[in-house]
Amino acid sequence: MVTKAPAKTEYEAVIGLETHCQLSTKTKIFCNCSTAFGADPNHQVCSICMGMPGVLPVLNETVLEYAVKAGRALNCEIAKYSKFDRKQYFYPDLPKNYQVSQFDLPIAEHGWLEVEIVDEQGEATRKKIGITRLHMEEDAGKLVHGGSDRLAGSTHSLVDFNRTGIPLIEIVSEPDMRTGLEAAEYAQEIRRIVRYLGVSDGNMQEGSLRCDVNISVRPRGQKEFGTKVEIKNMNSFSAIHRAIDYEIARQIEAIETGEPIIQETRLWEEGAQRTIGMRSKEGSSDYRYFPEPDLTPIEVAPSLLKQWQSELPELPAAKRHRYEEEIGLSPYDTRILTDDHAITQYFEATLKAGASAKQAANWLMGDITGYLNNESLSITDIALTPEALAELIELIEANTISGKIAKELLPELLTKGGSPKKLVKKKGLTQISDAATLESLIDEVLAAHPQELEQYRNGKTKLQGFFMGQVMKRTSGRADPKATNQMLAKKLKG
């Protein structure tokens, strides 16, 4: 079986994503139970989220606010009138035997999202992906299988209802994507947006963001869609990319060998790097939707819509564009700096403290990010403040210290914090830039190595690095590298 989609083919894939985002509310969508992650099983439930007789749900107003803000951030039209519906199906993790969702009148429709693909040369291409709808719904519980990570092969299954009733927004895209790379980037941009808005943490490992892929393959140029297959169980953006590439190759091979493609739901197996059949795919009629009688319809007042619109922050795409146009950063740099909202905030605070954009970007994307990755930390975990980073950059640009000395100071600043200026003074690391002092040092080094000096003047010019190293050794790295190198070159020529 081919496991990677061919780069060139007479077929094309048609891909759409359904993205579920858990909203970062303190309580569930229709009751006051906590939404905190990691509680003991079945300790965050009540008669409402468990669907006991005689209780009535009440919509959490923050859920509506977050849904509207997400809808506007995705350029959607906000419905003047929407409602909740019951989506009916039987599964052990659904205590009411129906899920409260939205069917024909969702809160937001007809939006779009622009994704940016940066190639290996750092060049960016942009593509607009349509958003069909965004709707609110409640999450189901979680099945825990004994003896296996899924139902097949398990010895028993347990149900944790803590997740039941946690508020979700489901974002349904148009089938505008054609590759696994585009789909993975679309999903990442959704996560960036909900994180910038503060409506979801977008944590895929904890299930706060989940993506289902709908994919079909057709001959290039054909307008009709092929048979649609849904893929589930992808817990990273790279898994989305790989699962789609695999499924494209599988469907192309099936078409070329005459094997029928059935409409079904398939699971991505991370270990085997393949999709496997799970069940036949249901249609909307199978769920027997009907209006939720226990919840009133939703009408968003124009004044409230205007207020929520005014509270939207600068979003990732706008920020990337500003960084490129106003600050002059490359598409690659802007992509890295805007991927994590916390790093974006740190970067902007560093600029506000007076640092140059390019230097701040280099430090953040280089040594600081390397440290964070090695230590599995977030930018919010370090002791180095944005103001201190700006101060460190100022010391380098003023030739008070060299970049090498700054890198040596960084580990202590990251773990203990404090003022770089005070640390440099305390350790006696101020850079030596005085011409007379440097000239004296160079003369001493040349006098101490007459043999190497003769070899240099006989054509072995690479020895300049040796002499430079000797000066740095005598000054413990404090000699101004640029000034030292220039003066050394003149002295060596005699």
Curated annotation (Swiss-Prot):
Disordered as annotated region, ranges: 475-494
One Pfam family cited in the UniProt record for this chain: GatB_N
Keyword tags: ATP-binding, Ligase, Nucleotide-binding, Protein biosynthesis
Enzyme class: ligase
Record-level Gene Ontology MF annotations: asparaginyl-tRNA synthase (glutamine-hydrolyzing) activity; ATP binding; glutaminyl-tRNA synthase (glutamine-hydrolyzing) activity
Catalytic activity: L-glutamyl-tRNA(Gln) + L-glutamine + ATP + H2O = L-glutaminyl-tRNA(Gln) + L-glutamate + ADP + phosphate + H(+); L-aspartyl-tRNA(Asn) + L-glutamine + ATP + H2O = L-asparaginyl-tRNA(Asn) + L-glutamate + ADP + phosphate + 2 H(+)
EC number: 6.3.5.-
GO biological process per UniProt: glutaminyl-tRNAGln biosynthesis via transamidation; translation
PROSITE patterns associated with the record: GATB (PS01234)
Keyword Ligase: yes
Domain of life of the source: Bacteria
Function description: Allows the formation of correctly charged Asn-tRNA(Asn) or Gln-tRNA(Gln) through the transamidation of misacylated Asp-tRNA(Asn) or Glu-tRNA(Gln) in organisms which lack either or both of asparaginyl-tRNA or glutaminyl-tRNA synthetases. The reaction takes place in the presence of glutamine and ATP through an activated phospho-Asp-tRNA(Asn) or phospho-Glu-tRNA(Gln).
UniProt record similarity statement: Belongs to the GatB/GatE family. GatB subfamily.
Subunit structure comment from the entry: Heterotrimer of A, B and C subunits.
Cited PANTHER family: GLUTAMYL-TRNA GLN AMIDOTRANSFERASE SUBUNIT B MITOCHONDRIAL AND PROKARYOTIC PET112-RELATED, GLUTAMYL-TRNA(GLN) AMIDOTRANSFERASE SUBUNIT B, MITOCHONDRIAL
Protein name: Aspartyl/glutamyl-tRNA(Asn/Gln) amidotransferase subunit B
Lineage summary: Bacteria, Bacillati, Cyanobacteriota, Cyanophyceae, Acaryochloridales
Encoding gene, per UniProt annotation: gatB
